Structure formats: C-alpha cells, structure tokens
Amino acid sequence: ATIIYPSPIFGPIHSRRLGISLGINLQPADGKSCSFDCIYCECGYNADHRPTLPRPTREAVREALEAKLIEMRDSGTAPDVLTFAGNGEPTGHPHFAEIIDDTIALRDKYFPAAKVSVLRNSTFVHRPQVHDALMKVDNNILKLDTVDIDYIRKVDRPVNPHYNVDDIIAGLRSFNGHVIVQTMFMKGRMGTDDVDNTSDRFVAPWL
C-alpha cells in the first residue's frame, strides 16, 4: 500500500536511523509532487497521486510546527530530530530556505538538543539558496542510487529529461563533507527490466 503523509506536520514516528522523528512535509496533503518517480517509492507513482491542493505556505509550516512542538513539550515527549520528508522532494518548495531558518529557530527555542534532517533526492543541489540552507542543517541526507544514468532513468525516473548525474556528483562534492549519501541497493525485476544494482558494475563506480 502507498503512503500519503499529512501536511505540513506528521508524526512523531520512531525511526531506526534517527530516533523519535517529527516529520515536516512541504508537499500537498492530498498527493505526491516529486522531481523523481522512483519505482520503489512508498508514496506511489506521481501519475497515480496528483495533488489538487497547494503546497503549505511558509507561515502554515511555521505555525503548525510550533503548535506541535508546544504539544510535545507539554506532554514530555522530546523529538530526537525534525525531519523534512513526506510526499516528494522538500527542496522544491519555493520557500525552502526560509522554512529551514524558521525550523532551526523553533528547534532552538523548544528542543535545542534535537537535530534537523533533510531527506532529499539531490535534484536541486545546484540552486544556491538550497545549498546554503542545507549547510545549516545537522543531517544533510542526499540520495544517489548509482552513477549509471541508464539505471537512474529506469529506476529513479527523473522528471527532468536533462538530468545529469555528473552535475549531481559535483553538487554532492560542493558540501565539502557536510553530507550523508544514501542509496537503495536492490535485486529483482520491474516487468521485463532487471533492476539489480548490487553487482560490481554498479557498486565499484559508486564507491
């Protein structure tokens, strides 16, 4: 079953990686909007979940986040992390940089020990305002499933036909180590296509 997350705030949930995670979803609450259309996405395919609602505004995100943090404080539940995730690519929001600033300010006010994490697919690493915002967060978690462009087009299915993996790699390097690279290794078939990326052909260049 696919998952469409509430917006702009969901959880908290218990993450094996991150601990008690309060989710921040910058996509519409009724669908998926993403610069990738990955075959393994838990939110399903883009075409099957077209949103009709707009993205939440910067103000709506700030107000909802503060209300939830107050609720968690009053209940004695401290988040380990505030995580940007949800129904698509968070850095595609037109006010992503400002929302990051708001989130850090609210984190510092209510739960200064909590981390701020961003889970993203690396599509917009070339945008200066996105890059600068990600340098401010604690966990800048970027996806790169492989360096093989044919595999990326088959499995990650970027919406932009001009997607260039060399540009993405250059973008990852531009963070000078302030980055966590995550990948999806898998075996299997998608229809008639082999989607195994665990062989040396894929792993050696990735390393």
Protein language model features and the residues they cover:
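Auxiliary Fe-S-binding modules of radical SAM enzymes
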Residues: 1-17, 63, 70, 193-207
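Glycine-rich beta-strand-to-loop/alpha-helix junction loops that act as flexible
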Residues: 83-89, 121
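Conserved AdoMet/S-adenosylmethionine-binding subsite of the radical SAM
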Residues: 92-207
